[in-house]
Amino acid sequence: TQNNQTVESTPEATAQVEFKDFGPEPFVFDIEAYTTQNETYRTSIWTGTYMQMTVMSIPAGGDIGAEMHPDIDQFLRVEAGSGVVMMGDEENNMDFEARVEHDFAVFIPAGKWHNLINDSDEPLKVYSIYSPVEHPHSTIHQTQAEGIAAHETEHAIEHGH
C-alpha cells in the first residue's frame, strides 16, 4: 500500500495474486497475471460506482451462455486460449461471429445478445469490464451454473419477484 492506495506491480506481487474485490478503492495490478491465474468461472476484481472488472475462466468446450445486458456496455479481452464470439439483436439470431485469441478485444454494445464460446482444448481466460456495474461487489462464481443461478436471483430481486 502506498499513500493508502493498493499497488500490485512487482514480480513478487504478481506471484501472490489475491482474488478479491478491491473496489471502490484505487487499485493498480498486473491484469494479465490475475486473468491467467484465475481458476473460477467469474470473480470480480474491482467494483466501483459506474464500472466493474471481472476475470473469467471458461473451460474447454464451454461458453458464457447467451446473454444480453439492456443498459450495460461490456468489454472483453482474451489473455489465453481461443474461441468464437457471437452477437446479434435476438437470442436465436446472433448473426455477428468472429474468432478471438490471445490479445483480442471485444466491445459488446448494450442491448446486444452475445455469447463467447471456447472451442479449444484449454481454458479461455478473459477479463471483462462492465459499465455500469453488472454483478454485486465481491462476486465469485466457481462455475457457470453458479453464475446463472446468481444472475436469476439478482434479477428476480431487482424486479420484485
Say what each PLM segment does.
Residues 1-52, 65, 98, 142-161:
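A short, N-terminal "cap"/entry segment at the start of jelly-roll beta-barrel domains
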Residues 51, 60, 71, 112-113, ...:
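A generic "binding-loop/recognition-motif" signal
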Residues 56-64:
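Short, well-structured hydrophobic secondary-structure segments
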Residues 90-109:
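Short acidic-glycine-tyrosine-enriched beta hairpin
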Residues 71-89:
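Glycine- and acidic-residue-biased ligand/ion/polar-headgroup-sensing regions
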